[in-house]
Amino acid sequence: MLRHKNGSWRLCNTLIDVLCLRAERQPEDSACSFLRDGEQDEVDVSYRELERQARAVGAWLQQNVASAGQRVLILIPPGLDFLAGFFGCVYGGMIAVPAYPPHSTRRTRLLSRLEAIAENAAPAAVFTTAELLPAVRQIFERTCRCHAIDNLLATEASELSDRWTSPAVSAQSLAMLQYTSGSTGAPNGVMLSHGNLLDNSEQIRLYYEHSQASRVFSWLPPYHDMGLIGCILQPLYLGCPLQLMSPMHFLQQPIRWLRAISDWKATTSGGPNFAYDLCVDRFDSGECAGLDLSTWSVAFNGAEPVRAQTLDRFAATFEPYGFRREAFYPCYGLAEGTLMVSGGWKTAAPVIEHVQADDLGTGRVVSVPVTSTGVQSLVSCGRSIPGQELKIVDPERCTECPPATVGEIWIRGPSVTHGYWQRPGLTKATFEAFMADTGAGPYLRTGDLGFLKDGELFVTGRLKDLIILDGRNHYPQDIELTVEQSHPGIRRGCCVAFSVDQRGAERLVVLAEVDRAYWSGARMEDRASKRENGELHDADERSVTLNRRSLILKAIRRAVSEKHEARVAEVLLLKPASIAKTPSGKHQRRACREAFLKGALREV
């Protein structure tokens, strides 16, 4: 249900109901604006116009696709055309399949992912843009119909919108397939119903304390749950303003994100942990003149481990510009749970728990003072959303863990989705878990590890990524953080740790990308020093490089040994962009491990 300006209630079972309602109640209000250059070049669309576009695209699908319930692949760059494509699929009674469009600089990686998605989803049609249509046709023309949505909207929208007929969809009907990032394997299509999307939208509204006075800004990719459900569907559900920016414009200049929040007076915006680190790493006080972040009341942080150090760095850097530490909103979610699983209090600062790292490695949670030796600071991801049951479960025994114990996070509730498209075996293993002692269920096995304390959820890592050395558990993200902090030449967020079997024992392997600018600068510095001391006569580029490599390798091994009491069996120093990541920026540890075992990684 949705509350409206006049205080009345109206039942909405589908996304079609919601957009129709907005076009009826707020026809001239802006549904979305988009910064085409990431700064000032703004275009927008009203609810009335977006609903008209959705009808037109839906009618085209009804005329050109065999039957309702077919999958439609959406390969459209971020912007207003994406919204028309997504809602057009919904209005046509189809199942939307958003995915990254082919891009020349990432063509090989994206092509293999697209092929895997297409093989599983078997789309009946593909929507893209006129600019990308030739490339998309090369990939898909033999298997399905490809169409440029901008051409359709420019030439046929008025005529088509009158031909639309409301499809027979309900809350139980599938609205979209959300393909997982593939951080632990091939992408799987999570089946989300209209009911899933509306239920989770309501939970987000409650936990963010949103209203029609809220203002949402996002640079997040619309192809993933956080960008699409949390930042595009949420404002539509609320009837509040939304402004978007391309992820590329953010990555090129992170200040654009903060400047947009300031200029547009956004109340809600956020991203993964790395986005906050990037803002601090690229901080330039000269670019921040006049910056005002005082309206930013929900700075959500999720999709990857939330680091206490990141929160401290960002708050210290941007508090002079009006940012409040209480605005930080760490949260936890996953596509299989639609999006949000847990979140904190809007007006409270994040909850930090300081624990003994050694005990955490054995699955025990022992709280200690922050000044203790071997302390690890964990950020709470808040409390379970209303109407959902969340338990910490022993993943092998399938029984609930005792207090102060790490286990797998299991959930059940109306936001839990319908399984994986065309993957019955994986669906049963993941979505149909039962307690061994009580028979309670079914639960969704998230594959994530964590613990509860005073109702707060602390996520510690991924079950499949866990590294076990000499009987002790190590979370790869903890080792990766230690590695990246061990030497200034290592790129932030570009380290991977995993284990391999060597002669019947698990051994630790670390991959670390070396910063190109630092490497070049260090090399020049060494050469200048040798030249000044008259030592350059027999020193060539290779000897200088080997010297720098040795320093970094020693720093990594020493840091991991001291912090984790673990021996690194092998370290590979790599060029930037060598480490495999998902389109959303998560490490693909399994792919990295396979590349290592195949000898496919090239060291600097």
Q: Model-derived features: where do they sit?
A:
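Conserved AMP-binding/adenylation subdomain of ANL enzymes
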Residues: 198-215, 225-267, 282-287
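AMP-binding/adenylate-forming catalytic core of the ANL superfamily
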Residues: 126, 262, 269, 413, ...
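Gly/Ser/Thr-rich phosphate-binding loop
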Residues: 266-270, 282-375, 389, 397-398
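Conserved pre-ATP/AMP-binding loop-to-beta segment of ANL
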Residues: 27-30, 160-186, 196, 200, ...
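AMP-binding/adenylate-forming catalytic domain of the ANL superfamily
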Residues: 493-494, 506, 558-587, 600-604
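Conserved beta-loop-beta connector loops within the AMP-binding
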Residues: 364-410, 454
